Amino acid sequence: MKTIIVVTIFGILTCAYPTDGEHCAQEKAMEDFDPSRFFNGKWYVVHYGKTGPTVCQKFSTNGTQGAPTQIVETGYDKFEDYLKFQCDETGKKNDYHYSFKCKSYECGSDNIEFEVDFTVLSASYDDFALVCRTITFTSGTKDKDDEVLVLEREKTLDVIDNCRRTYYLTEFEKMSLSSQFLSKKENITMLSFQLK
């Protein structure tokens, strides 16, 4: 009898917490999302699920069809040493998922290619946003990685104060997300959206 209960509980937990690479596809996107308000100005990533290098992302339109182009700079220690990637929008998978194809164009860098999908879960446009980002590497190991990003318009040295942490936890719980995304030490990252 104890074995049946343990197997049942394990099965329920397995369904409740999907494996990596599936979180963003299962999350409910913001229904009244306005891309023109979101893809404008600067955003700072104050938290993401896994520790890693600081990433600077700059978005601008390519001028021909009004689709944003994402410039990604990945580096350590405040961008003292970084690589640049250009990511062009490839279209939307549906009404809520914005997709980009990225490649390094720098001389001397490895030919790293990856695809990025953004799903905006919640946004106030002037203050904060919750975004689920899926990165799929199309070269090399072809790994897939999902992360929930907490974005703010203002860069602060205080990572997330207790008041905001409580608010973010409430937002995560409403969307049935695991609090595992909030268990790591936060890094400051910048997203800059500009229209040409």
Swiss-Prot record:
Keywords: Blood coagulation cascade inhibiting toxin, Glycoprotein, Hemostasis impairing toxin, Secreted, Signal, Toxin
Domain of life: Eukaryota
Classification via SUPFAM superfamilies: Lipocalins
GO cellular component terms, A-Z: extracellular region
BP terms from Gene Ontology: suppression of blood coagulation in another organism; symbiont-mediated perturbation of host defenses
Major location category of this protein: secreted
Subcellular location: Secreted
Residue positions with a glycan: N62, N187
Residues of the signal peptide: 1-21
InterPro entries associated with the record: Calycin (IPR012674), Triabi/Procalin (IPR005657)
GO terms of molecular function: toxin activity
Expression (tissue specificity): Salivary gland.
Stored Pfam families: Triabin
Keyword Glycoprotein: yes
rRNA-binding as UniProt keyword: no
Protein role: Inhibits the intrinsic blood coagulation pathway by blocking the activation of host coagulation factor XII (F12) but not the enzymatic activity of activated F12.
Protein family according to the UniProt entry: Belongs to the calycin superfamily. Triabin family.
Protein name, as recorded: Dimiconin
Organism: Triatoma dimidiata (Kissing bug)
